[in-house]
Amino acid sequence: MTEKAPEPHVEEDDDDELDSKLNYKPPPQKSLKELQEMDKDDESLIKYKKTLLGDGPVVTDPKAPNVVVTRLTLVCESAPGPITMDLTGDLEALKKETIVLKEGSEYRVKIHFKVNRDIVSGLKYVQHTYRTGVKVDKATFMVGSYGPRPEEYEFLTPVEEAPKGMLARGTYHNKSFFTDDDKQDHLSWEWNLSIKKEWTE
């Protein structure tokens, strides 16, 4: 069987163009206090807010960003050890590091993040993948809406399979974005993924 190199992914519309075609406008951002005071007589909304915020009072740090992305983990059962990327330190240093993934391995991306002050709507994780300077893929994952709490949230993408074959092996450069409906950039970072025949070569 002849091996094929990955083909560049052609994007007909990016997210901004799609939003404008649908005439979608996100609702204006409200503070947590405003949201808690709204619709006190609406039982369904009370349940929804309870789901987002829990039962206890929310204690927030006014100096902290509302959304903090802490780690990215590649969840792969066949990996010889954990594959985790710390996103709270020097993001420039991540550009020089390379994560190894064995070809054909099944994996999922897990994003760890915290919400500190206000409910955030329409969170999404976007990843652009390049090889030799050419964009070969773009993936957008809808994360959802979350309220503030002391514990971290985790978001897990669907299972993906790493490319395989001699032509698919090599280093892929990723540009990742954690954003929301208001197009607020909570975190952007770049990292490298090397597809190899074996975990260690």
From Swiss-Prot:
Organism ancestry: Eukaryota, Metazoa, Chordata, Craniata, Vertebrata
Record protein name field: Rho GDP-dissociation inhibitor 2
Modified positions (Phosphotyrosine) in chain numbering: Y24
Assembly, per entry: Interacts with RHOA. Interacts with RAC1. Interacts with RAC2. Interacts with CDC42.
One Gene Ontology CC term in the entry: cytoplasmic vesicle
Compartment(s): Cytoplasm, Cytosol
Alphabetical UniProt keywords: Acetylation, Cytoplasm, GTPase activation, Phosphoprotein
Any one GO BP annotation for this protein: cellular response to redox state
Ranges for region Disordered: 1-38
Modified residues (N-acetylthreonine): T2
InterPro entries per record: Ig_E-set, Rho_GDI, RhoGDI_dom_sf
Family annotation (Pfam families): Rho_GDI (PF02115)
GO MF annotation list: GTPase activator activity; GTPase activity; Rho GDP-dissociation inhibitor activity; small GTPase binding
Family assignment from sequence similarity: Belongs to the Rho GDI family.
PTM annotation (N6-acetyllysine): residues: K21, K25, K40, K47, K102, K124, K175
UniProt keyword annotation of Phosphoprotein present: yes
Signal peptide: none
Function, in words: Regulates the GDP/GTP exchange reaction of the Rho proteins by inhibiting the dissociation of GDP from them, and the subsequent binding of GTP to them. Regulates reorganization of the actin cytoskeleton mediated by Rho family members.
Expression tissues: Detected in bone marrow, thymus and spleen.
Oxidoreductase as UniProt keyword: no
Residues with the Phosphoserine modification: S145
